[in-house]
Amino acid sequence: MQYGAAAAEQAWYMPAAAMVVAAAAETAAERVERLASESAVVVFSVSSCCMCHAVKRLFCGMGVHPAVHELDLDPRGRDLERALARLVGAGGAAAAAVPVVFIGGKLVGAMDRVMAAHINGSLVPLLKEAGALWL
């Protein structure tokens, strides 16, 4: 098993079982924070939600391509929904918590906040500052 011994010495090597343990140790709130910081624009969504579809279409119409995390397709999606509901102050109502948008790693909020920012003209500067929009 020379390959196994050599691979174990490498700093980048992590066996699949260790990766699962590391992922399980990450709380839902930590996962939300990590995912929110991985792209300029991140949308936490439910695939059957019309408001989620509307916010995704808004960004695509502006030429912004957000990272979309469909919570209903994620095995840990329920936990993420609860963490997001706490973040946006939905009082534990997970259904009221989506879509949740992060721009530049910062919480913008749910659909009402995104649309308010779009209408009052503050959404485009946020997108430019995050590097999601160049024009």
Swiss-Prot record:
Cysteine-cysteine disulfides: C49-C52
Please state where this protein is localized. Cytoplasm; Nucleus
**Record GO cellular component, one term:** nucleus
Keywords, sorted A to Z: Cytoplasm, Disulfide bond, Electron transport, Nucleus, Redox-active center, Transport
Its predominant location is cytoplasm
| Pfam families attached to this UniProt entry | Glutaredoxin (PF00462)
* Matching InterPro entries: GlrX-like_pln_2 (IPR011905), Glutaredoxin (IPR002109), Thioredoxin-like_sf (IPR036249)
Q: Where is this motif: Responsive for interaction with TGA factors?
A: 132-135
Per the record, the similarity remark reads: Belongs to the glutaredoxin family. CC-type subfamily.
Function field: Has a glutathione-disulfide oxidoreductase activity in the presence of NADPH and glutathione reductase. Reduces low molecular weight disulfides and proteins.
From the Swiss-Prot or TrEMBL record, give the protein name. Answer: Glutaredoxin-C5
Q: Which organism is it from?
A: Oryza sativa subsp. japonica
